[in-house]
Curated annotation (Swiss-Prot):
InterPro entries: Methyltransf_25 (IPR041698), SAM-dependent_MTases_sf (IPR029063). This is C-methyltransferase CouO. Pathway: Antibiotic biosynthesis. The keyword S-adenosyl-L-methionine applies. Mediates C-methylation at the 8-position of the aminocoumarin moieties in coumermycin A1 in the biosynthetic pathway of coumermycin antibiotic. Active on both mono- and bis-amides for mono- and di-C-methylation adjacent to the phenolic hydroxyl before it is glycosylated by CouM. Belongs to the methyltransferase superfamily. It comes from the Bacteria. Keywords: Antibiotic biosynthesis, Methyltransferase, S-adenosyl-L-methionine, Transferase. Pfam families: Methyltransf_25 (PF13649). Its EC number is 2.1.1.-. GO terms for biological process: antibiotic biosynthetic process; methylation.
Length: 230
């Protein structure tokens, strides 16, 4: 089954939404700080979308060597244009998170590999985590934050999710897109199994998966692992 990239008007809509809500990235940035992000490191952002995270991170850590990768050529174009508008010289490239093809020069080189709100779209979830672990250097870390399937929400969580969608300043098309994102998202056990499968190929010294709604308003799954030192 082939994953479909976000293109055209949908890509533009995601960029408009992301560029107007930088505060929604605060929790993820805090998680990255906890994972040890620091100036001078190499960081790869898989499924980077239109590059909002890159703008935020390089504003806080100006010496990062940051590479954004996305399957959508439209998203890559938008990200490059957006970075130029913000006066940033950033690298964005076309690539599939489910394969390191096109990222061979980065294999085993990154201090940190991240992805935010994207792995729910993957058709081969273990392959996504495999790519993350292969890109990160021994001793480096990966961090993924993703949507949960609705079946993992308890009743209060589901009510919060419904209220969250209704309160977003989105048009009907975007509300449907986000609702479907959760409906088709993997279950919590799927994330656990996928990370464990990837770790069988590239050993890790630490891994943790947890769920909370901190900083976002709706429960999301956080997946962290540290590649075993050589």
């Amino acid at each position: 089954m082939k994953i479909e990239p976000i293109t055209g008007s949908e890509a533009e809509a995601f960029h408009r939404m992301g560029s107007r809500a930088f505060e929604r990235y605060n929790e993820f940035v805090d998680l990255l700080v906890g994972a040890g992000i620091a100036d001078g490191q190499t960081v790869v952002d898989l499924c980077c979308g239109s590059g909002e995270l890159e703008i935020i991170l390089t504003s806080r850590f100006p010496s990062l060597n940051l590479v954004g990768v996305d399957l959508s050529e439209d998203m890559v174009r938008i990200a490059r244009d957006y970075a130029a508008e913000q006066g940033k010289e950033l690298e964005f490239r076309h690539g599939d998170a489910q394969s390191p093809a096109g990222m061979e020069d980065l294999l085993g080189k990154a201090d940190l590999v991240v992805s935010r709100h994207a792995f729910h779209r993957l058709t081969r979830l273990p392959a996504g985590f495999d790519t993350m672990l292969r890109l990160v250097k021994p001793g480096g870390a990966i961090l993924n934050v993703s949507f949960l399937h609705l079946s993992d929400f308890d009743e209060p969580g589901f009510r919060t999710w419904v209220r969250f969608l209704k309160e977003r300043p989105w048009d009907a098309e975007m509300q449907v897109a986000w609702a479907l994102a959760h409906y088709y998202a993997p279950r919590l056990q799927d994330y656990r199994d996928a990370l464990a499968q990837a770790a069988d190929e590239t050993p890790v010294s630490e891994q943790r998966i947890w769920v909370d709604d901190q900083g976002y308003g709706v429960a999301t799954v956080k997946c962290f692992a540290r590649r075993a030192a050589a």
